[in-house]
UniProtKB/Swiss-Prot annotation:
EC number in record: 3.6.5.-
Additional record remark: This protein may be expected to contain an N-terminal transit peptide but none has been predicted.
UniProt protein name: Translation factor GUF1 homolog, mitochondrial
Localisation: Mitochondrion inner membrane
Membrane topology, as annotated: Peripheral membrane protein
Catalytic activity: GTP + H2O = GDP + phosphate + H(+)
Superkingdom, taxonomy of origin: Eukaryota
InterPro entries assigned to the protein according to its UniProt record, in alphabetical order: EF-4 (IPR006297), EFG_III/V (IPR035647), EFG_V-like (IPR000640), EFTu-like_2 (IPR004161), G_TR_CS (IPR031157), LepA_C_sf (IPR038363), LepA_CTD (IPR013842), LepA_IV (IPR035654)
Organism: Phaeodactylum tricornutum (strain CCAP 1055/1)
Main subcellular localisation: mitochondrion
């Protein structure tokens, strides 16, 4: 036993190899074993003392989730093993911002200021775990973290930060994350002002009835203009910016004020009074050793280790092996109550069992309600929807021997990404591969890059396409996700394509260029709003097929990089669409087929043939390239053959000798043309992307 010189002196001793804490009392000589921990700092940060006064201390130390039992009413704090659980001291919030406005940096400063993460463990973009996220400077997979903060009123508050992806491709995931919160920090760059994604995130926050706290970030930049940007926010969004927080996530300016605003303005979560357990899933990922890890927000009731839970959308049931909180590393606890954010795992092998937006309930409570004849036994939380792919493309391995490797790699990515869909596809020109569905172009690029980087697979990627609807006479409508599957339409048949509503924020001097671009892409101008005398927003409705190619590149080019855009799917509309086929050496090339509007078919066919002529290498025989609608050729080009001078060895003599050599060469080229194969490079398949230039 370790003796102390001072009477009644209590000390913590951490045994690093066993991660066990001993509480030694020198007067009584007894020890108490504490729960496993990663060190004294970790245990102190996970202990949460709640009392009516900041000077009161519980007699026994532990975490907030020290025991089980049914939760009392929200007005009566619940004591568990000497710990007071008080939902009124919980604040669930998210950070929303346009790309590169400082969202991840602000999250780093909040974790650092509250000492949630030790200074030696801090690194830039702490919540961004993937290398791709750090390289691109974007958030792809959302994260969550619990922060303990002692406010200026002396009370200790539990702040649950739920980080969100910032790109429009992941808007559904963002909406489910915001549904798990009561408040949101709206971060706006003080030098750039409001951008398109800023407005999109604000709309999502308003739909979920969140308290929005505006923050001007990067005020330390020489180009910062806080007064102008604050006026933009008031004029555009309608938020009161009289007391807006001026902050710099890089230098730490204003971080304490932000924490105080969270405590004062974000309402506490509504706590249920004895209802059944319900929780909202806002993210999940696959771990090779533990299976699927589910991140959720408890809406009603409580869940403990050992409970059996049911996922309502998939009807899957699993035993809970572990529940815990994120700080931001995962820390196991005994129980999670209404209003808290945490994780669970329990030998779940398929991420489809725990989809984003689904509702978790206790299997026992579900069966009890079902036995009483309730329908449904437990009401699901609103807002769940299956992820619907918006963009499709073909992925083919360069080496045919890597087909199995590609299938295994897609299966592993699918475990972490429920929005990714794929099915086998074969092509005479490309061999065997997969037809993959994605939420958008960024999602597609990320999956391709991960396949090449993490699994070392060289890919041939076909041009992306959207999903079309076809209504044939006397038949039910059906979907087309591959241009080669588009049928020839009769007089009474109808083809429909997806339309999006797009908002473009731009300096007003570029309004004309953007309107011209919208008209070129078959768009309908809906509205023009002037946010300030120098900035405006232009609203268009246009086909998604015109957006997924090079629209964003053209927008940046015509506005010198100043414009930003955001779009959302609205509906399907009838269009005069045709399938444009490409024949190379009189053979159909299905990967190069595309669906276009009839009015643009001839011009697009000419540009496509011209592009392929430049990209396909010359052969020893002539290669014709044809663009066709049905059996009608609307454009054509030909690649001239490389010429071999068979007369070089003839130095005069009879002309018949030369004719014989030329006839022999022509005969050989004719045979070569009939059996020869044309190698089409990867760049040729992406030529479809540049047809609108």
């Amino acid at each position: 036993m370790i003796q102390s010189a001072a009477p009644s002196c209590r000390r913590w001793w951490a045994l690093g190899f066993a991660a066990v804490a001993l509480w030694v009392d020198s007067t009584s000589g007894w020890t108490t074993q504490r729960p496993p921990m990663a060190g004294l700092r970790r245990f102190q940060s996970s202990a949460w003392y709640m009392s009516s006064s900041s000077t009161e201390k519980p007699t026994t130390s532990g975490t907030i989730n020290g025991g089980g039992g049914k939760q009392k009413a929200a007005s009566q704090p619940k004591k568990t093993a000497g710990i007071v659980y008080d939902a009124q001291k919980i604040r669930n919030f998210s950070i929303i911002a346009h790309i590169d406005h400082g969202k991840s940096t602000l999250a780093d400063r909040l974790l650092e200021t509250t000492q949630t993460v030790a200074q030696r463990d801090m690194e830039a973009q702490l919540l961004d775990n993937m290398d791709l996220e750090r390289e691109r400077g974007i958030t792809i997979k959302l994260q969550a973290a619990r922060v303990l903060y002692q406010a200026r009123d002396g009370e200790m508050y539990c702040l649950n930060l739920i980080d969100t992806p910032g790109h429009v491709d992941f808007s559904y995931e963002v909406s489910r994350s915001l549904a798990a919160c009561e408040g949101a920090l709206l971060v706006v760059d003080a030098s750039q002002g409001i951008e398109a994604q800023t407005l999109a995130n604000v709309y999502l926050a308003l739909e979920n009835d969140l308290e929005i706290i505006p923050i001007l970030n990067k005020i330390d930049l020489p180009a910062a203009d806080p007064e102008r940007v604050a006026e933009e926010i008031e004029a555009t969004i309608g938020l009161d910016c009289s007391g807006i927080v001026h902050a710099s996530a890089k230098t730490g300016i204003g971080i304490d004020d932000i924490l105080e605003r969270i405590v004062q303005m974000v309402p506490p979560p509504p706590a249920a009074t004895g209802g059944p357990f319900r929780a909202l899933i806002f993210d999940s990922y696959y771990d090779a050793y533990r299976g699927v890890i589910v991140f959720f927000r408890v809406m009603d009731g409580e869940v403990s280790q050992g409970d059996k839970v049911r996922f309502l959308a998939s009807d899957a049931e699993h035993d809970v092996t572990e529940v815990g909180i994120m700080q931001p590393n995962q820390v196991p606890v005994d129980c999670l109550h209404a209003g808290e954010v945490g994780y669970l795992w329990g030998n779940i092998k398929d991420v489809l069992d725990a989809r984003v937006g689904d509702t978790i309930v206790l299997a026992k409570e579900y069966k009890e309600s079902a036995s009483k004849g309730k329908s449904p036994p437990i009401e699901a939380l609103p807002g769940y929807a299956d992820s619907v792919p918006m963009v499709y493309c073909g992925l083919f391995p360069v080496d045919a021997d890597q087909y199995e490797s590609l299938r295994d790699a897609l299966g592993k990515l699918r475990l972490n990404d429920a929005a990714l869909s794929y099915e086998p596809e074969s092509s005479g020109a490309m061999g065997f591969g997969f037809r993959c569905g994605f939420l958008g172009l960024l999602h597609m690029e990320i999956v391709q890059e991960r396949l090449q980087r993490e699994y070392d697979i060289d890919l041939i990627v076909t041009a992306p396409s959207v999903v079309y609807k076809v209504k044939k006479e006397h038949q039910e409508e059906f979907f087309i996700d591959t241009p080669a599957k588009m049928p020839d339409l009769g007089r009474n048949d109808v083809a429909l394509e997806p339309y999006v509503r797009m908002e473009v924020l731009t300096p007003s001097e570029y309004n004309g260029a953007i309107i011209e671009l919208g008209q070129e892409r078959r768009g309908d101008l809906i509205d023009i709003k002037f946010l300030t005398p120098t900035r405006s927003t232009i609203v268009y409705e246009l086909p998604l097929a015109e957006v997924i190619t090079d629209f964003f590149d053209q927008l940046k080019s015509r506005t010198k990089g100043y414009a930003s855009m955001e779009y959302s799917l609205i509906d399907y509309r009838a269009s005069d669409l045709v399938r444009l086929d490409v024949k190379i050496n009189y053979e159909m090339a299905p990967p190069l087929a595309c669906v276009v509007h009839r009015d643009k078919a001839q011009s697009i066919g000419r540009r496509l043939c011209a592009s392929l002529k430049d990209l396909i290498p010359r052969q020893m025989f002539k290669i014709p390239i044809q663009a066709c609608i049905g059996v009608k050729v609307i454009a054509s080009e030909s690649i001239s053959p490389m010429r071999k001078d068979v007369l070089a060895k003839c130095y005069g003599g009879d002309i018949s000798r030369k004719k014989k050599l030329l006839q022999k060469q022509a005969k050989g080229k004719k045979r070569m043309k009939s059996i020869g194969k044309v190698n089409v490079p990867q760049e040729a398949f992406m030529a479809v992307l540049k047809l609108n230039e």
